[in-house]
């Protein structure tokens, strides 16, 4: 359950869904969006819905946005999904607005009739739907696209742990990249009893693990 912060704004980080269904956490574009996000990759078959319980400060009509992108704006491409609340699907297909960059895609409005509802992400194409954040607001506001302001919104409205403790540690081996060589190096280090740290999706190496 996401706790509420702010006035009539509900912010959802999809990677915190309690039931991710067939969706998985991905971080390939973390340099562009700031945090991990949910990815639906079903090899052409829509994956199971991701669901969670979500609390609202008050009932009524809410505007809805999802932070995503249209991967192939020419039409008919992958990466499309829908959002439903208590089984009521918002009449909008996200990832289909022709904007080929990460941005807030407006999905229209939906009426919330209970303080606690089930939120679902519904994959449509089975190919790489991605959702970085969802925002509900009583007012039709302008949401930020720059990462610094987005982080401020996350800290203000989202379920963000503000007491993160960073621990410095020493490692015998650092594996950068998750290809065949990186995986073999990490496995062999573990067999030899070395302390192995595997760095997934390093921006510099463009790892695809």
Segments predicted by a language model, with ranges:
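Hydrophobic/small residue at the entry helix of a nucleotide-binding pocket
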Residues: 181
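Conserved small/polar residues in nucleotide/adenosyl-binding loops
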Residues: 198-205
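Bacterial Sec-dependent N-terminal signal peptides
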Residues: 1-7
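Beta1/beta-strand and adjacent pyrophosphate-binding region of the FAD-binding site
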Residues: 168-178
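Loop/turn elements at helix/coil->beta-strand transitions in domains of secreted/extracellular proteins
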Residues: 170-172, 192-195
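Extracytoplasmic
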Residues: 7-165
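Aromatic pocket-lining residues of Rossmann-like dinucleotide-binding sites
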Residues: 189
């Amino acid at each position: 359950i996401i706790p509420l912060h702010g006035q009539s704004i509900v912010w959802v980080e999809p990677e915190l869904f309690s039931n991710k269904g067939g969706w998985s956490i991905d971080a390939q574009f973390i340099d562009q969006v700031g945090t991990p996000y949910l990815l639906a990759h079903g090899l052409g078959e829509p994956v199971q819905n991701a669901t969670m319980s979500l609390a609202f400060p008050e009932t009524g009509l809410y505007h809805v946005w999802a932070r995503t992108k249209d991967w192939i704006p020419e039409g008919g491409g992958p990466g499309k999904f829908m959002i439903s609340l208590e089984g009521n699907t918002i009449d909008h297909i996200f990832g289909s607005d022709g904007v080929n960059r990460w941005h807030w895609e407006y999905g229209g409005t939906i009426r919330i009739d209970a303080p606690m509802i089930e939120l679902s992400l519904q994959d449509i194409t089975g190919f790489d739907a991605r959702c970085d954040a969802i925002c509900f607001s009583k007012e039709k506001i302008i949401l930020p696209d720059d990462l610094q302001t987005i982080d401020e919104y996350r800290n203000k409205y989202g379920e963000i742990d503000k007491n993160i403790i960073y621990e410095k540690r020493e490692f015998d081996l650092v594996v950068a990249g998750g290809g065949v060589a990186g995986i073999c190096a990490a496995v062999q280090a573990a067999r030899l009893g070395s302390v192995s740290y595997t760095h997934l999706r390093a921006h510099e190496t463009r790892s695809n693990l």
